[in-house]
Amino acid sequence: FEKWKASAARREIVAFVTRLNNSCVNKPNLTIDAAPPQVRKLMDALRQIAKGCDQYLPKPGEARRYGSPMFRDWHAWLVSSTPGLVSSLGADNAELSARLAASFGDRTRIDYGTGHECAFVVFLLGCFKLQLITDGDVDSGAVVCGCFAEYVRTCRIIQRCFGLEPAGSKGVWALDDYQLLPFLFGCSQLSDEEHGFGDEDTGLLTVNASALAQRSMFYECLAFVDESTGSTPLDVAAPILFNLTMQPWRTNARRLLRLFDEEVLGQKPVVQHMLFGELLRADWDVSEGPSEESERLARMKAVMDAANRKLGIGS
């Protein structure tokens, strides 16, 4: 893990997230019709992933302690579908397919967290390296304001549909139970706007977050948290999030970028599940420890093959 913390792979992810963050300064969320062609393809693929939930809806009244077991069936469908979705983007790349399949939760634990969110960032980085998205797509803000915003909406649909458990949730001491990066990008989208969304005395919101959701991913996430916490004042339900109301948006963005580096990329329980391969290399001597990257890719291929057999594909 110490080798990972000092690795070029970690620096590459931080640099890419920083570039994405800089690209969306003062830019609203992008509709699919306004997106450039390749970003539109990505957004359409994400919508197909969300629509796939309709085939695996949890049974009414099903007995469950945590998330719905139907998530496992949906995830098998996802794994079998990602090669076709990636092919529709213009590439036949097993590693890219595996990274996309790893971006929506863990089928064994039926949970979702910032590690899965990070997997999607690395998927986008892979798309960039394979020239499926261009410098212009990235630096115009289209990848963040279009594709990443669509990814967050897709994740919310999946989280609600299957009742996914938060992976490594810190409860009230987190921004929300699942996401981090849409708060970062959302703050940058609001960079030059007057800060403040809550009343420090009452702990209540002073904005209609749902009405502002198209303006910024931050408000979209704020609306989700407000809906999830019910009548509990935000300063009680999510004090870390509420504290952001007191600082300018640019200050919040800097803090959240540092938080991503420290609390996502800097945490072994998160990054131990990261896939390594041609698109994100382990730049340390793997002979000094277990060769996890090849084993993970082999396991992912085995899961894909099993899912295909279950669905009668290629049999």
Tell what function each PLM region has:
Residues 1-103, 107-117, 141, 145-149, ...:
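N-terminal leader regions that mediate targeting or early regulatory function
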Residues 123, 130-175:
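Glycine- and acidic-residue-rich phosphate-binding/metal-coordinating active-site segment common to enzymes
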